[in-house]
Regions:
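Post-transcriptional modification and biogenesis factors for structured RNAs
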Residues: 1-154
Length: 154
């Protein structure tokens, strides 16, 4: 199983889409606060449809709570400041795929907890700011699942 880690997500429909994605791929979702919304937000529920009960979602008040409860989870940070193409990562079961908030990405201190070799980037236009969070999570998660043979999904 892979873990999706959202650091301070801000937009409920993105998180709802990611809940649905995690439910359908058996990935565990970790929400690291403070969140930009409450989990019962109608927009989040609409985007996640009825998949919330199928998803394994864990919530943490802050980054230190997440790292304290998951001290051995290897992390891969997805960032426009990453230098490693995402498809060159060597994903393993139990890895965490870390994504920052929609408006600003991962802060330096959080990104700095991942060695440069574990900072991944999706290809995109150089004059563009970023890709949509839920799309980036889907691309990264499915690459990890592909590398692991889509175990338990067929």
């Amino acid at each position: 199983m892979l873990n999706v880690v959202l650091y301070q997500p801000e937009i409920p429909p993105n998180t709802g889409n990611i809940i649905r994605l995690c439910a359908n791929t058996r990935a565990r979702l970790h929400l690291v606060g403070p969140l930009g919304f409450v989990l019962d937000d109608a927009r989040l529920k609409r985007a996640g449809l009825d998949y919330r009960d199928m998803a394994e979602v864990r919530q943490y008040e802050h980054w230190n709570a997440f790292t304290g409860q998951n001290p051995n989870m290897p992390l891969w940070a997805f960032s426009t400041r990453g230098s490693v193409p995402y498809h060159e990562a060597g994903f393993r079961k139990g890895d965490g795929l870390l994504f920052g908030p929609e408006s600003r990405g991962l802060p330096d201190d959080v990104l700095g907890e991942c060695p440069a070799a574990r900072r991944l980037r999706l290809p995109m236009r150089q004059d563009s700011r970023s890709l949509n969070l839920s799309n980036t999570v889907a691309v990264g998660l499915y690459e990890g699942l592909r590398q692991l043979g889509f175990e338990n999904l067929y």
